[in-house]
Amino acid sequence: MHYVDGFVAAVPTANRDAYKKYSEGFAAIFKEAGVLHYVETWGVDVPEGKLTSFPMAVQCKPDETVVFSWMTWPSKEVRDAAWDQLMKDPRFDPAVTPMPFDGKRMIFGGFEVLVNR
């Protein structure tokens, strides 16, 4: 059964091009590791909520944009084995590949697919 990793982050709006380049590089790395599908999206209509929302969850500042991303793996087992190797990959070191956003405010998680049509 497919497995999905999902991410939400706040990226400085001025860093859109840098974020796209960064994401394209990571998409290639994840594809090497076995990801079936890698998607990065740039927030266009992401309203602030009263109780909770994407912007609130990542403490989005006025000069930032929310990004929503996910990748699909063949299975959780493939994903777990790949992440073990990816965490040792020097390309994941922020000193080697600096993040164009504040990674401390990124939220992420792994999900089993319930419906896929």
Task: Provide a role label for each language-model segment.
Residues 31, 35-62, 88-117:
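Glycine-rich beta-strand-turn "strand-cap" elements at beta-sheet edges
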Residues 1-25:
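Long, hydrophobic N-terminal alpha-helical segment
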Residues 4-11, 49-86:
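Short, well-ordered beta-strand segments in beta-rich or mixed alpha/beta enzyme
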Residues 18-31, 66-71:
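Generic detector of contiguous secondary-structure segments
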Residues 20-26, 82-90:
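Short amphipathic alpha-helices in soluble, non-transmembrane regions
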